[in-house]
Design a protein with these regions (language model features):
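An amphipathic alpha-helix/helix-turn recognition signal
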Residues: 11, 91, 96, 168-171
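Glycine-rich beta-strand-centered segment in the early N-terminal region that forms part
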Residues: 31-47, 60-113, 156-159
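Glycine-rich Rossmann-fold phosphate-binding loop(s) that bind the pyrophosphate
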Residues: 80, 169, 195-198
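Beta-strand segments within the central parallel beta-sheet cores of soluble alpha/beta enzyme folds
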Residues: 99, 190-196
Length: 198
């Protein structure tokens, strides 16, 4: 599998901010996992803190502890599996590209992300909201994250870091507006109130 360019050596270990109990993180270090044929190893460059992260930190409503939070992240590809050629939109991927990711469709890795009907998303997971496992690099609150087969990943190399970190929150906004339109209550030029910011 392609590796990082000379001078950009990949360490053998990575640190994660592991939430080990409510309102408590521990900085833990783990060996970097092997990168499978369909996986991508990303060096984390930035991650936003979502309201969901705050809820998980305070109350663990999803029962995820221990967990590495962070789902509004972005970073640089440092290693790719041999089968990884393009992102979820068909744009070519290579070591050094900047990426974002969101869902993992573990039950059906071939689900069409752009299918507006979204018939089966019951088996979807989100990086940063995965219970800990033997990989450990499951959230963006870490040095590295392993993007696994069946994940949505997008090449956003043309954007600066601040813009890349805002992609996931903006996607949530667009999704919320699209869902609101399906209620039949909203019409073109409807006035709405946006309450809260997360």
């Amino acid at each position: 599998a392609p590796a990082a360019p000379a001078g950009n050596t990949i360490p053998k270990k990575a640190r994660v901010a592991m939430m080990t109990e409510k309102k408590h993180f521990e900085l833990q270090e783990y060996d970097l996992p092997e990168v499978g044929d369909d996986d991508i190893l990303v060096k984390v460059e930035g991650c936003g803190v979502c309201g969901t992260d705050a809820h998980e930190y305070k109350n663990d409503p999803f029962g995820l502890i221990p967990v590495v939070l962070g789902h509004e992240g972005t970073g640089e590809i440092v290693k790719m599996g041999k089968n990884v050629k393009v992102d979820s939109a068909g744009k070519p991927l290579k070591v050094g590209d900047k990426v974002v990711t969101c869902m993992i469709f573990k039950d059906d890795p071939d689900i069409e992300m752009f299918d507006l009907n979204k018939k089966n998303v019951g088996g979807a997971d989100v990086y940063g909201l995965l219970p800990d496992d033997d990989i450990h690099l499951n959230g963006w609150f870490s040095d590295y994250i392993l993007i696994r087969e069946g994940s949505t990943v997008f090449n956003v190399s043309d954007l600066d870091l601040k813009s890349r970190v805002l992609i996931e929150p903006c996607a949530v906004l667009v999704h919320a507006v699209e869902r609101a339109k399906t209620t039949g209550i909203l019409r073109f030029n409807s006035r709405v109130v946006v309450q809260g910011c997360g």
